[in-house]
């Protein structure tokens, strides 16, 4: 499986958010989209998921445009994990997860053994079995994100697109989710994930795409992309980079305002 975007341009009114962006993801690799807030990472992810049309350029899945593939087939080939999610879904968690795998079923009583196994595996992997009879309105932000991850995993899609899946999670669940995403990639799924934590991006992603100033500043292996010079170019501040006990870290240097005497 290969998803490829070529010469993507995205505008907001008269302002160009992204220009001439090329990106591809293949089966078995985990690609991280990183960059400052407002750089267009989520918008690009939505374009890859066929949830937003680009103003220029095209996206193809195995050589076919997403329009030619069609929504029904795309719902089986591409799973999309949105940030936050709708907390007002009234159904139980187990039904919500099943809906990810069976979006076109009117009822879920006729699940096949394969469906049941995929749903159960997804709920176990995302650690939401204990939440199965609750609704989203009664869950914390981190619990909701894990439910949405289970919903995406249940699809068993060729491509998984995840928008900041660890943003609302505690450190333990951040590591568990990132490990789960990497294991999913190792099992043959292409994974694209939007991240702000550069340390997690360096530890878990095979390739990184650094987006800023309307385009791609750099893409490649973490060691190449996460250089102080490139991070400074993207974020507009000098970065301190290093390794502590085998774990990479990336921190902006402290910016101190000038001291002024108060009259």
Which role does the model predict for each range below?
Residues 34-36:
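The feature captures the beta-strand-to-loop junction immediately N-terminal to the Walker
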Residues 110, 135-139, 143:
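Conserved ABC ATPase signature
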